[in-house]
Amino acid sequence: MRRMLYAQLPSRALVVVAQLGIADILAEGPADISTLAERTSTDAVALARLLRGLAVFGVFEEGAEQVYSLTPLGEALTSGHPASALPSATLVAGQFGAAWGDLLETVRTGQSPFERSRGVSLFTHMEQDEELRAVFDDSQGRGLALELDEILRAIDFSAYPTVVDVGGSDGTFLRRILSAHPDISGIVFDLPGSTSLQAERPTADPLEGRYSVATGDFFDSLPEGGDLYLLSHILHDWDDDRAVQILRTCRAAMSDDATLMVVDLIAANRGQRDERLHTAALMDLYMLSLFGGNGGQERTAAQVEVLLSKAGFRITRVDSLPSGMNVIRAVRAA
């Protein structure tokens, strides 16, 4: 129990390491504590204790004479890592971490901290805070990079000639799908402020001509003509009514032959304690802290099925992956 109570300390230590840029310094090569303290303007004794603690958790290697180096785990805190946790650390250091600290009031009121302090939801707040939105999108994209290999091994996307990535942000998922399957094409769809793919498209893009970018609101309408409509970590951001509305918008754009694919964590049923469900449990607490008691959430398989049924879908297949991620496929119900 005490280990759980004190678990926030390694988290805070990682945030400090991220704020000081220590992983990027060590990416240049091993360094002793005096060098690290000088380059980060910190106290050498305090910094050594911080790094020593994280070395026990496998983030750093501590060598002779307090020389530190990165482990493969620690490399995930470097800015250049494809699945870098730096954007997530930035969120925890700022408004998201503050929301965690306000969890008691969230549980008492059911309201999110953003509703209480600003009178708007998190997503409405991010429309007004471009810097926060950019860090959030970056964090989402880097986190997705951790899942893509597993998903692409498990799912044959070649069966879907045109993929519509709904709420696809910078197109990370779609680009990986297209790279793995050269005979298909796709559309990235998101709010105008969220879709940075058009602006960031590489000058010599090997996927040129195989995808397009469409903007709009997935509560209103979506591009028609897709064979697969992909919702990756979208439904868990919304309450039940809004989630059903997103699904109905997908259904309206889909033909009878099209497939809906929902990629999300699945929460534990009553009494389940499978270790694979720990990630979903942590993420649901995360969602509670940000969205309040009646907002975004991780759902059980039965709850997801209810949402799909309300929106006019019938589940055809569920793939439960080793990481705890689930890929749910559905079609329009008769």
Swiss-Prot record:
Keywords assigned: Antibiotic biosynthesis, Methyltransferase, S-adenosyl-L-methionine, Transferase
Binding positions (S-adenosyl-L-methionine): 190, 216-218
Pathway: Antibiotic biosynthesis
Record flagged with keyword Cell cycle: no
Domain of life: Bacteria
Biological processes, Gene Ontology terms: antibiotic biosynthetic process; methylation
Enzyme Commission code(s) on record: 2.1.1.-
Entry keyword annotation includes ATP-binding: no
Enzymatic reactions: 5-hydroxy-3-methyl-L-tyrosine + S-adenosyl-L-methionine = 5-hydroxy-3-methyl-O-methyl-L-tyrosine + S-adenosyl-L-homocysteine + H(+)
Active site positions, chain numbering: 236 (proton acceptor)
SUPFAM superfamilies listed in its UniProt record: S-adenosyl-L-methionine-dependent methyltransferases, Winged helix' DNA-binding domain
Gene3D superfamilies tied to this protein: 1.10.287.1350, Vaccinia Virus protein VP39, Winged helix-like DNA-binding domain superfamily/Winged helix DNA-binding domain
Molecular functions (GO terms): O-methyltransferase activity; protein dimerization activity
Entry similarity comment: Belongs to the class I-like SAM-binding methyltransferase superfamily. Cation-independent O-methyltransferase family. COMT subfamily.
Function noted in UniProt: O-methyltransferase that mediates the methylation of 3-hydroxy-5-methyl-L-tyrosine (3-OH-5-Me-Tyr) into 3-hydroxy-5-methyl-O-methyltyrosine (3-OH-5-Me-OMe-Tyr), a core structure of saframycin A, a potent antitumor antibiotic that belongs to the tetrahydroisoquinoline family.
Name used for this protein in its record: O-methyltransferase SfmM3
Organism ancestry: Bacteria, Bacillati, Actinomycetota, Actinomycetes, Kitasatosporales
